[in-house]
């Protein structure tokens, strides 16, 4: 991130590096717990796993205050329009973590008529966390992967 340190005490770096560093340490998640994966998401927020180490300390109740949504559980056809509405109300840049087999591809209920076979059919997903249910460690690993993805993005378009 730091490209050079001058003798006068200045640090030179790019705008993208500074902005992406700030974004990785200030993820504001919103829980969208639909099934048993939500329990593991709650475990990740407890003191044992301490999700605040990664900058995702407080789960927001309002989509307008969050920039990350963690979809944990089975997304049904009736819930899909409400989920899309919540996603549209989130602040930019929006990020989505799909947590668990049901959110990733329908899971155990894949062949049911009322289940959306993956939340990526409704919103774009950044990180998939596999498992049924995935452990709290797997969710933390997914957050770390999202942070790596944020660091690789470019804020300023290059010509």
From Swiss-Prot:
Q: Which residues bind [4Fe-4S] cluster?
A: 36-37, 102, 132
Q: Name one GO cellular component term.
A: respiratory chain complex I
User: Which residues, if any, are the signal sequence?
Assistant: none
An annotated Gene Ontology molecular function: NADH:ubiquinone reductase (non-electrogenic) activity
* GO annotation (BP), single: electron transport coupled proton transport
Chief place of localization = membrane
Q: Can the keyword Magnesium be found in this entry's annotation?
A: no
Q: Does the keyword 4Fe-4S apply?
A: yes
Catalysis performed (reactions) = a quinone + NADH + 5 H(+)(in) = a quinol + NAD(+) + 4 H(+)(out)
Q: Which SUPFAM superfamilies match?
A: HydA/Nqo6-like
Q: Which NCBIfam families does its entry note? A: nuoB_fam, PRK06411.1
Protein's job? NDH-1 shuttles electrons from NADH, via FMN and iron-sulfur (Fe-S) centers, to quinones in the respiratory chain. Couples the redox reaction to proton translocation (for every two electrons transferred, four hydrogen ions are translocated across the cytoplasmic membrane), and thus conserves the redox energy in a proton gradient.
Q: Which HAMAP family match?
A: NDH1_NuoB
The protein's name is NADH-quinone oxidoreductase subunit B
Q: Which gene encodes it?
A: nuoB
């Amino acid at each position: 991130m730091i490209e050079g340190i001058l003798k006068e005490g200045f640090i030179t770096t790019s705008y993208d590096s500074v902005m992406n560093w700030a974004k990785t340490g200030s993820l504001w998640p919103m829980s969208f717990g639909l099934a048993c994966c939500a329990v593991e998401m709650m475990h990740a927020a407890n003191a044992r796993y301490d999700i605040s180490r990664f900058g995702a300390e407080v789960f927001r109740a309002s989509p307008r205050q969050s920039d990350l949504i963690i979809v944990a559980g089975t997304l049904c056809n009736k819930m899909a329009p409400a989920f899309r509405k919540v996603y549209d109300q989130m602040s930019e840049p929006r990020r989505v973590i799909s947590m668990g087999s049901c959110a990733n591809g329908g899971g155990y209920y894949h062949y049911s008529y009322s289940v959306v076979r993956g939340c990526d059919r409704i919103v774009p997903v950044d990180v998939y966390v596999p498992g049924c249910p995935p452990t709290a460690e797997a969710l933390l690993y997914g957050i770390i992967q999202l942070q790596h993805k944020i660091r690789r993005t470019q804020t300023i378009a290059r010509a």
